[in-house]
Regions:
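Extracytoplasmic gate region of multi-pass secondary transporters
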Residues: 36-37, 219-273, 332
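Helix-breaking motifs and short loop linkers at transmembrane-helix boundaries and internal kinks
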Residues: 48, 80, 101-107, 169, ...
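Conserved MFS/SLC helix-loop-helix module at the cytosolic interface between two early adjacent transmembrane helices
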Residues: 67-106
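Cytoplasmic membrane-interface "Motif A"-like loop-to-helix N-cap segments
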Residues: 78-89, 281-293
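Cytoplasmic helix-loop-helix junction between adjacent transmembrane helices
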Residues: 111-152
């Protein structure tokens, strides 16, 4: 869909600077999320929680995060994306630090809920702004670079949390204190150094102006929304429960679970860049996604079926190479390819709202299935089934070759 607005002549940020700051933003978005996971057993012990209640800590975060997606996208389009992003960073940076002082399970849930609200202001405005600034011929590659910050953040959060809590004997609270201040500073940097282009809608008639419901009537957008739900479900099963799975099922030492879990993130970085380059080169996203989803499902099955530690690690590496983090830039490009520029923030808000709905369900459902069945495998099998559904969804997308 073409651009329906007129950019002003005001000087805008070089797209490479924007990519750098948004990359850093994702590092701390995910680091602040992931510092919880290696210390879940300590929290479970201190507050005498069930596995379902531990899963609720993540689910409440993602509930408020998901609730903010569409409103934050609309606010970004209306008042300025960089301003909305900076406000969100201030909120979730503050409550990252306050999570560490929680004295009861209820206060811990409240702090995580506020972290979710703060982080909820990032996704739609960020990808809306980056999609405006990055040239079409670099759109998937640029998104892949930005998105790779998620992998760095996952690694940083998992490894640093394990190291601070267990190796340095800082306990589960200290990692939250450590990450709070740099989080706020990144938001300030985005506000100061990333300037967005201005658009003039005054020359358009009311009939010509795009409407919110147009985004829900677009076939390709709706199918991409469903795709991201299927992809993210398995990813958040991995993010939330993989360290516990490695410790309880595989007998991995607590101090090592963070590093092994981070292999998923590390291998996704070169993969996402490679797929982004290929997609931009051929001008299509759909064929690449169709290759990746079956391989991601097979990776999870290998993780569950093998008794070998070597093959287990191989399965995690393969999931990183073919899974959510590797396919995300392709789905992001699909959204940008099918959305008017002055609705990008809103479109990405809907996209992430649908995707993150899976993150509300996955942590709690997987913990509940473990409590009911006595096995962690049941939750992972659900992830595989949704990936297969995602393949069917992508087959229904109609895509034209993108021209630079």
């Amino acid at each position: 869909m073409g651009d329906t607005t007129v950019p002003s002549k005001e000087k805008q940020t070089n797209w490479k600077i924007a990519v750098l700051f948004f990359f850093l933003g994702w590092i701390f978005i995910y680091a602040d999320r992931m510092i919880l996971n290696p210390v879940q057993t300590l929290i479970r012990s201190e507050f005498a929680l069930t596995n379902a209640e531990v899963g609720l800590i993540s689910s409440i975060f993602f509930f408020t995060y998901t609730f903010l997606q569409v409103p934050s996208g609309i606010l970004g389009d209306k008042f300025g994306k960089a301003k909305v992003i900076a406000f969100g960073f201030a909120v979730f940076g503050l409550f990252t630090g306050l999570t560490g002082i929680a004295g009861t399970f209820g206060i811990l849930l409240m702090a995580r809920a506020m972290m979710g609200i703060g982080q909820g202001f990032y996704y739609g405005p960020q990808y809306g702004l980056s999609s405006e600034l990055i040239p079409t011929k670099y759109r998937t590659l640029g998104s892949a670079i930005i998105n790779s910050g998620q992998a760095f953040g996952i690694t940083l959060g998992l490894v640093a949390s394990s190291y601070i809590a267990f190796d340095l004997e800082g306990g589960w609270r200290m990692p939250f204190y450590v990450f709070a201040i740099p989080t706020v500073l990144i938001g300030l940097g985005i506000l100061l150094f990333v300037k967005e282009p201005k658009h003039d809608n005054t020359t358009m008639s009311e009939a010509e102006k795009p409407k919110f419901m147009d985004l829900l009537k677009n076939r390709n957008l709706v199918l991409t929304y469903l795709l991201v739900f299927c992809s993210l479900y398995g990813f958040f099963v991995m993010c939330t429960w993989l360290p516990v799975y490695l410790e309880e099922v595989r007998g991995i030492a607590r101090s090592d679970t963070g590093f092994i879990s981070s292999l998923v993130a590390w291998t996704s970085i070169p993969a996402a860049l490679l797929y982004g380059y290929i997609s931009d080169k051929i001008g299509k996203r759909r064929p690449v996604i169709l290759c990746l989803l079956p391989l991601a499902a097979c990776s999870i099955m290998l993780l569950l079926m093998t008794e070998s530690k070597t093959l287990m690690i191989t399965a995690l590496v393969c999931y990183g190479f073919f899974g959510k983090l590797a396919t995300d830039p392709l789905a992001i490009a699909l959204i940008a390819d099918n959305t008017p520029r002055n609705q990008l923030s809103t479109a990405f808000g809907i996209f992430n709202f649908v995707g993150m709905s899976s993150a509300i369900v996955a942590p709690y459902a997987t913990g509940l299935l473990r409590d009911l069945t006595g096995s962690w495998n049941s939750g992972f099998y659900v992830s595989v089934g949704l990936l297969l559904l995602g393949i069917v969804t992508v087959l229904c997308i109609k895509e034209k070759k993108q021209v630079s």
